[in-house]
């Protein structure tokens, strides 16, 4: 069974299963709850499935961009599970788990999340019969620059404050900017070329925080080293 973990936003989402179909899921709202809630949520999923942690064959982590503190919670737990059990370690762009909701062959879909400061984290993907092609890699953008870079996508899925969401009115035929993250979709991306990425060295891997944050600066000062910028193509 695959265990999917998304702690990139204020909603903690975990799922257990082979694919989104038939998977079991738990969500906990509140960014400050992630550290205390993640392991109990995983244990509840295992209990509901009637299995132990030995049944987990791979761990799939949402790798950002998103909250520095939230991402580190998911990364720490995911790495610990992988190192302890030797199972596969996969990563998925957090925005891709939103964009898949509007996917269909030939469609370009956009995943969005709030980046504060009048910006949003955005990424765009083209869905092909044989895989997924990145059109715009995930990064922080202003609504105006995003609309200029991609004039007419087919679907836009994300979660934004009302003031930011209003700037995307009429941008796409399908627009859902009140979509809660759901880790079940991450399970499907492991089987899609261009979706999830298998990491060969989990201990050396770091997620995509999107941009430096105060929490990141404090972490680097405490540990005496800079966090590397992740490469989705390596590792």
Where are the model-predicted features located?
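DPxDG-like acidic metal-binding loop motif
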Residues: 60-89
């Amino acid at each position: 069974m695959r265990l999917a973990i998304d702690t990139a936003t204020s909603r903690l989402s975990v799922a257990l299963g082979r694919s989104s179909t038939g998977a079991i899921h738990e969500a906990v709202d509140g960014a400050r709850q992630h550290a205390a809630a993640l392991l109990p949520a995983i244990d509840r999923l295992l209990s509901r499935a009637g299995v132990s942690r030995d049944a987990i064959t791979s761990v799939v982590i949402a790798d950002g961009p998103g909250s520095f503190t939230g991402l580190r919670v998911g990364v720490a737990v995911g790495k610990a599970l992988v190192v302890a059990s030797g199972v596969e370690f996969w990563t998925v762009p957090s925005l891709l788990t939103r964009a898949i909701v509007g996917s269909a062959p030939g469609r370009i879909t956009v995943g969005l999340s709030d980046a504060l400061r009048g910006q949003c984290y955005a990424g765009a993907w083209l869905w092909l019969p044989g895989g997924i092609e990145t059109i715009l890699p995930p990064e922080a953008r202003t609504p105006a620059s995003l609309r200029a870079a991609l004039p007419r996508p087919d679907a836009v899925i994300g979660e934004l404050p009302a003031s930011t969401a209003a700037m995307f009115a009429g941008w796409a035929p399908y627009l859902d900017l009140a979509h809660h993250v759901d880790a079940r979709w991450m399970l499907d991306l492991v089987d899609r070329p261009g979706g999830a990425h298998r990491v060969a060295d989990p201990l050396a891997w770091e997620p995509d925080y999107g941009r430096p944050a105060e929490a990141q600066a404090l972490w680097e000062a405490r540990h005496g080293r800079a966090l590397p910028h992740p490469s989705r193509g390596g590792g």
